[in-house]
């Protein structure tokens, strides 16, 4: 299955058989607990795009920038939040913030922060007993997301240049 592929890929990439994998893909987010190299449990957000690469892409398009630009710009922002977890409503909030003259970096921060909070909440529901956290999927290439997840979860979230491809290994 897709879950097993992501787990085996992460075990190979990180050379660790006990971990919690946070996979943020384009269409879904998966939290996969691996013990002794095998999937113990998993949770998947596949009902909506909130907390996924698609969410980031839609919000970046609303700000007329690329997703990777938004991730980097988010480092410079602060002080703004997006309260809605629904992509459609969050986009309305972003448009409203633009209309209010809010700085792009603060809006970018709010978008990335909403992804981080949603994913961290999923990870905390899944497992509090973690020996290692790693980030896979396309959004692992946004170093600010792994840094923000590290801060939010209180434990280092590791990435690797090959993390994006964990499900394909």
What are these regions (language model features)?
Residues 29-34:
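Short beta-strand scaffold segments in enzyme catalytic cores
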Residues 1-22, 37, 120, 124, ...:
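Conserved phosphate-binding catalytic cores of ATP/NTP-utilizing and phosphoryl-transfer enzymes
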Residues 23-28, 137-139:
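A short acidic Gly-Thr/Ser loop motif
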Residues 38-82, 86:
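Glycine-rich phosphate-binding loop plus the immediately following alpha-helix
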Residues 123, 128-152, 162-166:
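Glycine-rich phosphate-binding loops at beta-strand->alpha-helix junctions
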């Amino acid at each position: 299955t897709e879950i097993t592929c992501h787990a085996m890929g992460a075990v190979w990439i990180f050379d660790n058989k006990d971990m919690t994998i946070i996979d943020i893909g384009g269409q879904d987010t998966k939290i996969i607990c691996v013990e002794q190299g095998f999937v113990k449990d998993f949770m998947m957000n596949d009902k909506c795009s909130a907390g996924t690469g698609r969410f980031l892409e839609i919000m970046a398009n609303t700000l007329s920038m690329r997703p990777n630009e938004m991730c980097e710009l988010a480092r410079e922002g602060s002080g703004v939040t997006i309260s809605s977890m629904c992509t459609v409503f969050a986009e309305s909030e972003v448009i409203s913030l633009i209309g209010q003259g809010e700085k792009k970096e603060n809006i970018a921060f709010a978008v990335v922060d909403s992804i981080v909070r949603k994913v961290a909440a999923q990870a905390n529901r899944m497992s509090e007993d973690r020996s290692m956290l790693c980030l896979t999927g396309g959004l692992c290439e946004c170093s600010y997301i792994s840094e923000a997840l590290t801060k939010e979860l209180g434990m280092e979230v590791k990435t690797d240049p090959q993390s994006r491809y964990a499900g394909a290994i």
